[in-house]
Each structure stands twice: as structure tokens, then as C-alpha cells.
């Protein structure tokens, strides 16, 4: 139920901010958990423009709220990510994620199991075996529960994602 409420809240935040092009952002309220936080379409574009294009997994945290009672010390985190090849598979035991695709298109593989990629006796990466491929493009949302393997596996030319991380 908590995940549904958080997902619905994030969806409404994103839908309102993406459709509103007027007014200025209220600014970063990272340290003030008593105020709302707006991540406007203009803010997303500005953060994306600052990401290093030469880094396969470039991101910047735009909002982070603490919760000393959680296992990670965080209540939640919001970030702007740009994904380009190559990407490694990931799995988080104590963190769910909501990905809002805000630019580009591609595929994200989830579920299955993570296996090592071995070349000449050396582990050179990780991939998902037996997973589900989700074709995604701007406007799509993907909920990744804690413990679920996930990996961006196709890019056209990259994926720009607003990631909402929810430690459990």
C-alpha cells in the first residue's frame, strides 16, 4: 500500500511539473522536509544538460530526504539519470525504484536472475538471464520492487530517466 501511495504521489508530481511550463521552480528543498518540492520540465532539462555525456551512467541527485529509522538512513531520493551503453544489471535488496522515462527510448530488462559475463576467464560485467524486456519511451513509468533485477539493455540513442528511489 505504501508503494502505491508513493507511486501515485510521484506520478502526480511528475504529471503536473511536466505539463506546467510557467512560473519558476521553488528551488531545492532538500533540507526542508516540511515543504513540497517541484522538479519542473525546465529543471529536468537543465540537470540533463549538466550530465557528463561520456559517462554511461550519469546522474545527479535533485532531492534527498533523511529518515534515521530506515535501514539506509534515507526516506527517499529523486535523481535525473542519463543511461548509455554499457550498463550492468543491478538488484537492490532494500530499495524499490520508480523510473519515469523523460527522454529517448530503449528497453529495460527486469526479473530473471543476474549472471556474470566472463571473457577469457575474467568477469567483465553482469547481465540478466531469463528476464522480461520492457520497451520504453518518453512518458512511460516502470516500478521496480526491491529485490528485482533490472538493467537498461537497449538505447535510442540514450534514456533520460527521473528515478525515485524508495528505501525499504
What are these regions (language model features)?
Residues 6-15:
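Bacterial N-terminal signal peptides
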Residues 1-5:
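Positively charged n-region of N-terminal signal peptides that target proteins for export
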Residues 20-91, 126:
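A short, N-terminal "cap"/entry segment at the start of jelly-roll beta-barrel domains
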Residues 156-168:
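A short hydrophobic beta-strand segment most commonly corresponding to one strand
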Residues 136-149, 153-155:
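Conserved metal-binding segment of the jelly-roll/cupin
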Residues 115-138:
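An anionic, turn-rich surface loop/hairpin at beta-sheet edges
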Residues 90, 96-100, 133-134, 141-142:
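His/acidic/aromatic-lined binding-pocket segments of jelly-roll/cupin-type domains
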Residues 93-108, 112-114, 120-122:
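Short, conserved beta-strand element in jelly-roll/cupin
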Amino acid at each position: 500500500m505504501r508503494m502505491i501511495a508513493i507511486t501515485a504521489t510521484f506520478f502526480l508530481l511528475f504529471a503536473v511539473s511536466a505539463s506546467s511550463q510557467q512560473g519558476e521552480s521553488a528551488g531545492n528543498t532538500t533540507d526542508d522536509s516540511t515543504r513540497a518540492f517541484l522538479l519542473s520540465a525546465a529543471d529536468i532539462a537543465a540537470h540533463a544538460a549538466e550530465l557528463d555525456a561520456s559517462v554511461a551512467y550519469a546522474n545527479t541527485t535533485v532531492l534527498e530526504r533523511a529518515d534515521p529509522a530506515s535501514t539506509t538512513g534515507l526516506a527517499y531520493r529523486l535523481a535525473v539519470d542519463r543511461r548509455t551503453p554499457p550498463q550492468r544489471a543491478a538488484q537492490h535488496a532494500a530499495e524499490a525504484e520508480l523510473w519515469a522515462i523523460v527522454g529517448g527510448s530503449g528497453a529495460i530488462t527486469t526479473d530473471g536472475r543476474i549472471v556474470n559475463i566472463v571473457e577469457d576467464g575474467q568477469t567483465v560485467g553482469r547481465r540478466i538471464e531469463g528476464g522480461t524486456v520492457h520497451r520504453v519511451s518518453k512518458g512511460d513509468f516502470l516500478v521496480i520492487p526491491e529485490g528485482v533485477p533490472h538493467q537498461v539493455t537497449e538505447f535510442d540513442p540514450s534514456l533520460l530517466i527521473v528515478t525515485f528511489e524508495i528505501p525499504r
